[in-house]
Each structure stands twice: as structure tokens, then as C-alpha cells.
A protein has these predicted regions:
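Alpha-helical protein-protein interaction modules
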Residues: 1-59
Length: 59
């Protein structure tokens, strides 16, 4: 999740594509990823990670 978010933050969605596919396999949907992050991190950290993950191409 960190690597996916980092690549998204650097506007490198092509490089993040394999990781986005893995997140889909693990979490199912973007909502599943968001739910995991909200349970695990404080709101501000979860929001920042989700921003990067969305920018990586996970919608």
C-alpha cells in the first residue's frame, strides 16, 4: 500500500499498475482498501495514503 501510494504521489501510475492489481486482489475494491487504512491509521494518514493510491489508478 505504501509503495502504491508513493508511486501515485509521484504521478507514476504505469509503474504502480502491478501493485494496483495486487491491491484489487487483496482488498477487492477501493472501499475495501479505504476501510483497512481507516482501521489501521489515523484519519490524516489514511487520507494521504488513499490520495496516492487513487492517483496510482485504483478507482
Amino acid at each position: 500500500r505504501y509503495a502504491t501510494a508513493a508511486l501515485g504521489a509521484m504521478d507514476r501510475p504505469a509503474d504502480a499498475a502491478p501493485m494496483v492489481a495486487r491491491l484489487r486482489a487483496i482488498d477487492g475494491t477501493i472501499d475495501g482498501t479505504a476501510a483497512y487504512l481507516r482501521r489501521t491509521y489515523v484519519d490524516s494518514a489514511a487520507a494521504r495514503l488513499m490520495d496516492g493510491i487513487r492517483r496510482a489508478g485504483f478507482h
